[in-house]
Amino acid sequence: MACPFFMPEEKLENGNWLHAGRLPLGCGWSGQCSAPGHEGETPSHEELREFCNLGYAKGCSRLPREREWDSVRFAARTVGDAQNGTEGRIHVRYVCEREHRPAGSGTLEFDAFEARWVGRHRDDRVQRMAECFLQAFLEKKRKRAAAS
């Protein structure tokens, strides 16, 4: 679960995570904070590793007391079929959590053939996290296909 105030920008290749592929966004990311009063600040390498990429960042000094969510988690799956014209669609499911409980959820749809989102999340941060998660998901999928 990534911090809901984290705005990921690019993959972080040297994050020193034991199992980077298991991180909430599919790998480690560098980026900026979007917490009120800290917009555009660049977290340290340690903050990225301990808070931003992991969510439930109660130890982070930037985390506002009043917030809608504590973390956001994602999952993806390929859906659709050729008969109804939805082949190549990927559903990215998100769950926003507060105090370890669901506080909002939904599904974002990506058309892999047209390389575009069918619908976008109302919150730019969640949308960007979904884009990063999808990028990591597709890279893992390509690697698995190449290995078989």
Regions found by a protein language model. Give the residues of each.
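Cysteine-centered metal-binding/redox modules
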Residues: 1-148
